[in-house]
A protein has these predicted regions:
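A conserved hydrophobic secondary-structure block that centers on an alpha-helix together
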Residues: 129, 414, 418-424, 428-431
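Short, glycine/acidic-rich beta->alpha junctions
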Residues: 130-133, 224-226, 331-337, 425, ...
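Acidic/polar, glycine-enriched structural segments that form the non-catalytic walls/loops
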Residues: 1-328
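Conserved short hydrophobic patches within well-ordered secondary structure
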Residues: 138, 205-207, 409-412, 429-432
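Substrate-binding groove/exosite segments of carbohydrate-active enzymes
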Residues: 270-417
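Beta-strand segments within the central parallel beta-sheet cores of soluble alpha/beta enzyme folds
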Residues: 121, 151-152, 317, 353-358, ...
């Protein structure tokens, strides 16, 4: 059992050696409900295609006809630092902090190339009310005069490793489900466009920098990553700052708040609006407990629910591992209807309604599934994803889970009872009942 986490009322902290720690990367997950990334870091020299990526609600690609997997998308957490022309490597422990109050992730560490050292403070957040954006900030403090080159962009190597529903089978296959289609570079920003295999969903990641002390170079595509070089001279004791905005939009966006990247943006202004939004959220749902460990445990659990729920999108639900992993194909299970929905019924009725709308709008797929099972009416599937059809491939699990329809009906009934939403009852819930 790991005991190397420091638990505070609003923060989880750790100090560890080395880049690769899958346990910590799970703990330090960050998201805004629409999309999220695990707690991996920029500057890691080794590529880990299945562990480094970004998950975005509703983005599925086909691994076989009619069967999808939750796409591990190319990652915009992709940086390399050169000091005096030499690639810098990790030269200290890494201190990570997840601040639940502001839904922010920080990391502090030192990079070195020969005798040249740079202390790095890294910040990451997903603006709560601007769900298309990912913000990152790099504060690089050099201990001696140095020529800096920061190569920043998008890691193209992210892959899925589909795990068979028959768990006696091994999963050794790597599949890239969102290959690069093209790169656009207009000098001040660049974008990469991807398309999912089989489902044909388009994803655009646009990257912009605020780096007044750096010179921005020409975008380069190595095949493994698309990066832009930023170069600068730093005097001993100087701290240089790079701010990176990534705007991610898709061909299936349903949340009306999703918009193009702002033409004129301020990291601090976006940060301020983000913290205010989370402050309002916590004022509504926070509960205080006398025990510190129980307190952070409760807040962490609530944060995970909110960070994994696309509250304004009625076309998706909360997957088996939220936005952290493609296990179980990223499918939606009855756990959301019975165990997660009650939190949203009490704290975010918009989210609760949209979780229920996902099920109600999948009624036709449930009817089709009932016919395939030689049954009357509707039968909701064990594993659901993009269109509500059954995604489970083994008869001994999917065919035997007969309680799902009752779970869905119960959840819709609880929403109607809690909210008194007559329109939803008449037009959405009643046909299911």
């Amino acid at each position: 059992m790991r005991n190397d986490l420091k638990l505070l009322p609003w923060e989880i902290c750790s100090e560890a050696d080395g880049w690769n720690d899958e346990f910590l990367e799970s703990v330090f997950f960050l998201g805004n409900g629409r999309m999220g990334v695990r707690g991996y870091l920029p500057f890691e020299p080794d590529s880990r295609p299945t562990q480094q990526g970004l998950f975005l609600a509703g983005i599925f690609g086909e691994i076989k006809d009619g069967i999808t997997d939750f796409v591990n998308l190319p990652s915009p957490v992709c940086e390399t630092l050169l000091l005096n022309g030499t690639t810098a490597v990790l030269a200290s422990p890494i201190h990570r902090t997840l601040d639940l109050k502001s839904a922010s992730f920080y990391a502090d560490f030192t990079l070195a190339a020969g005798d040249t050292r740079a202390d790095v403070r890294y910040t990451r957040f997903f603006p709560k009310e601007l769900p298309a954006l990912l913000m990152q900030r790099f504060e690089i403090h050099v201990q001696s005069d140095a020529e800096l080159e920061l190569r920043s962009g998008i890691n193209l190597s992210s892959c899925n490793s589909p795990i068979p529903d028959d768990q006696v089978k091994e999963n050794t296959e790597l599949v890239q489900l969102a290959p690069l289609q093209f790169v656009t570079d207009d000098g001040s920003l660049f974008s990469c466009t991807f398309e999912t295999v089989g489902t044909g969903l388009r994803i655009e990641q646009e990257v912009q920098f605020h780096a007044p002390e750096f010179t921005q170079g020409i975008v380069q595509n190595s095949g493994a990553e698309v990066t832009c070089p930023l170069t600068a001279h730093a005097a001993a004791g100087q701290t240089l700052v790079v701010e990176k905005l990534v705007c991610i939009r898709t061909s299936r966006d349903a949340d009306e708040r999703i918009a193009a990247a702002p033409g004129d943006w301020s990291f601090h202004a976006l940060w301020g609006a983000h913290t205010v939004a989370w402050s309002h959220t916590w004022q509504n749902c926070d509960r205080t407990l006398p025990d510190e460990e129980l307190q952070i445990g409760l807040r962490y659990s609530m944060f995970q629910l909110m960070a994994s729920c696309a509250a304004h999108d009625p076309t998706v639900s909360i997957g088996a591992r939220g936005l952290t992993h493609a296990r179980y194909k990223g499918c939606y299970f009855w756990d959301t209807d019975l165990f997660m929905l009650p939190f949203f019924l009490k704290n975010d009725k918009t989210a609760a309604k949209n979780l229920c709308l996902y099920r109600a709008n999948a009624l036709d797929a449930a009817r089709d599934h009932a016919k395939k099972m030689n049954a009357a009416g509707a039968r909701y599937p064990w594993m659901a994803a993009l269109d509500g059809s059954e995604q489970c491939e083994t008869w001994d699990i999917g065919c035997s889970e007969v309680h799902i329809t009752a779970d869905v009906a119960y959840a819709l009934g609880e929403y109607c009872r809690e909210t008194g939403d007559e329109e939803f009852y008449l037009h959405k819930a009643a046909p299911v009942f």
